[in-house]
Design a protein with these regions (language model features):
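Compositionally biased terminal segments of proteins
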Residues: 1-165
Length: 165
C-alpha cells in the first residue's frame, strides 16, 4: 500500500471503535495541551494486557496496517504483525489506510503504561464518540526530553512558553 495522507480522526476512530485502550503521545498529543503543529503520524502507547492487544490487532486489520520498512530493512526482514509479536513489546511503525501509526510499547522516559495512564488527560474531539486519552503535560515534557531531538526540544520550549502566557 502506498503512503496515505494522515487522517488522525479516522485512524483513532478505527482503534476506539474496537475499544482499544491507548494513550496518544508525540506530535499529535501537543494539541491536547494547546499547541497544534503538523505531524506525519499518530503515536500511541497501548495498554499492554493481552485482551487489549487482541483488540489492537483486530483494529489494525480493519485499518489495513502493515509494518513500514525503514533504513536498511526491507519488508521481508520485518516481524509479522501478529499477537505473539505484539506481546513481545517493542515499537511498530505502521502504514495504514488513514496514514502512519506508531505503536510504541517501549519509549525512553516512560516507566510503564500505568504511570502514563495516571497522568493522562481525556479530551473530546469533534466527530469522535469517545474521549481520547493523551499524555499529561509533565509526562509529555519528560518523553520529549528523553527523545532529545531538535523538534522535541522546540516543542518543549513552545509548550512552556504557552503555559507561562
Amino acid at each position: 500500500m502506498p503512503e496515505q495522507p494522515l487522517k488522525p480522526l479516522d485512524l483513532l476512530t478505527g482503534l476506539r471503535t474496537l475499544e482499544v485502550e491507548f494513550i496518544v503521545i508525540g506530535g499529535y498529543c501537543l494539541a491536547a495541551h494547546g499547541y497544534v503543529r503538523g505531524t506525519k503520524d499518530v503515536d500511541i502507547v497501548p495498554e499492554p494486557e493481552q485482551a487489549n492487544l487482541q483488540r489492537l490487532l483486530a483494529a489494525l486489520g480493519t485499518l489495513q496496517a502493515e509494518p513500514l520498512a525503514l533504513g536498511d530493512f526491507d519488508a521481508g526482514e520485518l516481524l509479522e504483525l501478529n499477537l505473539e509479536n505484539l506481546r513481545l513489546g517493542g515499537n511498530w511503525l505502521l502504514r495504514t489506510r488513514f496514514g502512519r501509526l506508531d505503536v510504541m510499547q517501549y519509549v525512553d522516559g516512560l516507566e510503564s503504561y500505568e504511570q502514563l495512564r495516571a497522568g493522562a488527560v481525556a479530551r473530546d474531539l469533534p466527530g469522535l464518540r469517545y474521549p481520547l486519552l493523551f499524555a499529561g503535560y509533565d509526562d509529555l515534557i519528560a518523553l520529549k526530553q528523553a527523545a532529545g531531538r531538535p523538534r522535541d526540544l522546540e516543542d518543549i520550549a513552545e509548550l512552556e512558553r504557552r503555559r507561562q502566557a
